[in-house]
């Protein structure tokens, strides 16, 4: 009896997780099924017309815009996260580590809508950013940030920044300081230590953070809707437009499936390229 109880206990602990994954899988299958249905008869009919409609230039432009903004925000978020992650991993003061961690986690703790409204205040014609640029004499008149790609890009970087910084900080913290000391002893500069020692060793964490940021921003909805409006039509916004006024569930589902497949394809390709580059780097050594 004791052996049976001990064998069953891990499954009991996994039951909530398995149930949650089953619900997610069921929801994904429901979306896929509706994507091959007809409007008004989603569950009984079979039609690929919703996918055919996505081949229009309007949807292709939106798909390209979504992937491009997700990629740009990923690159910039990772670059900005490198010094923050190094500071989090190498800070000796416990207070400094806590303050850095709190600052990084803040975007995850504040509601996404509130963050987007905050960006509306910052990026508006009379907002903080424009007033600062005017006061410094950098610009002569307010810059139009809202309802432009640049404004959406800033919002995407800020909201997804923790996803880039946290895995990177964890990977850097696991690297022994003896590597840096050995490189410094051999005359390496700080830039050389960062480029040839820290970044290659932290590449798994960097890649994990980059993939998280890309997947998160490719499916972003609140930020492009509030900061971009109809002028920056990312695919998630088009999904909402198909549902709210039109109730066209097959079209919305097909758009979601295409977005999911495109995101997975880009993530798989990037991971393969990184693994290949790491293998080539290892062979050269």
Protein language model features and the residues they cover:
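Short, Lys/Arg-rich, polar N-terminal cytosolic tail immediately upstream
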Residues: 1-7
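Membrane-water interface segments at the C-terminal ends of transmembrane alpha-helices
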Residues: 8-40, 57-173, 197-221, 228, ...
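Glycine-rich helix-loop "coupling/hinge" segments at transmembrane-helix boundaries
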Residues: 40-43, 221-247, 284-285
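A short amphipathic helical element positioned immediately N-terminal to and/or at the very start
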Residues: 46-55
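Short glycine/proline-centered loop/turn elements that form peptide/ligand docking sites
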Residues: 175-179, 279
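The alpha-helix within a helix-turn-helix
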Residues: 183
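Glycine/proline-centered hinge or cleavage motifs at structural transition points of membrane proteins
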Residues: 186-188, 200
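Short cytosolic juxtamembrane segments of multi-pass membrane proteins
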Residues: 273-285
């Amino acid at each position: 009896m004791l052996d049976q109880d001990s064998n069953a206990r891990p499954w009991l602990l996994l039951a909530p997780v398995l149930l949650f994954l089953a619900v997610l899988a069921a929801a994904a299958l429901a979306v896929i099924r509706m994507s091959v249905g007809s409007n008004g008869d989603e569950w009984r009919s079979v039609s690929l017309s919703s996918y055919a409609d996505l081949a229009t230039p309007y949807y292709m432009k939106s798909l390209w815009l979504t992937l491009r903004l997700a990629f740009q925000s990923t690159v910039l978020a990772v670059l900005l996260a490198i010094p923050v992650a190094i500071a989090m991993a190498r800070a000796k003061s416990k207070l400094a580590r806590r303050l850095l961690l709190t600052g990084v986690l803040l975007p995850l703790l504040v509601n996404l809508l509130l963050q987007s409204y905050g960006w509306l205040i910052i990026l508006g014609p009379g907002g903080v950013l424009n007033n600062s640029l005017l006061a410094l004499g950098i610009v002569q008149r307010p810059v139009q940030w809202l309802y432009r790609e640049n404004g959406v890009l800033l919002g995407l970087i800020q909201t997804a920044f923790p996803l880039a910084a946290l895995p990177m900080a964890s990977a850097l913290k696991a690297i022994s300081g003896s590597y840096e000391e050995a490189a410094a002893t051999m005359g390496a500069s700080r830039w050389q230590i960062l480029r040839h020692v820290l970044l290659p060793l932290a590449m798994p964490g960097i890649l994990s953070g980059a993939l998280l940021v890309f997947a998160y921003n490719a499916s972003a909805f609140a930020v492009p809707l509030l900061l971009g409006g109809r002028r920056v039509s990312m695919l998630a916004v088009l999904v909402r437009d198909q549902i709210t006024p039109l109730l066209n569930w097959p079209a919305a589902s097909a758009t979601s499936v295409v977005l999911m497949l495109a995101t997975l394809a880009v993530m798989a390709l990037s991971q393969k390229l990184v693994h290949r580059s790491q293998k080539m780097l290892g062979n050269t050594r």
